[in-house]
């Protein structure tokens, strides 16, 4: 009967809704900045959240989605900055522990 993976599958799970061209254009060039990897990641999260309703924002207002995208970029920047700090301190701690135990 249904050619999309089973009789109980909903088409909305497999295909996205049509996005407004303004939102697509806005996610491609936000302030004409150079898109780094985490910005592309945030763009894809916004488009997925907008088309499937996973974000907590309403579908009728693209401004909320832009704010949500900027929050994603900000939180991802914090992860990129903080992760090496924890890694370096962990390596220093391991080095100190091995040096400390090698004395005795």
Curated annotation (Swiss-Prot):
Keywords noted in UniProt: Membrane, Transmembrane, Transmembrane helix
Highest taxon in the source lineage: Eukaryota
Main location: membrane
Transmembrane segments: 72-92
Gene Ontology cellular-component annotations: membrane
Subcellular location: Membrane
Membrane topology annotation: Single-pass membrane protein
Protein name: Uncharacterized protein YJL007C
Source organism of the structure: Saccharomyces cerevisiae (strain ATCC 204508 / S288c) (Baker's yeast)
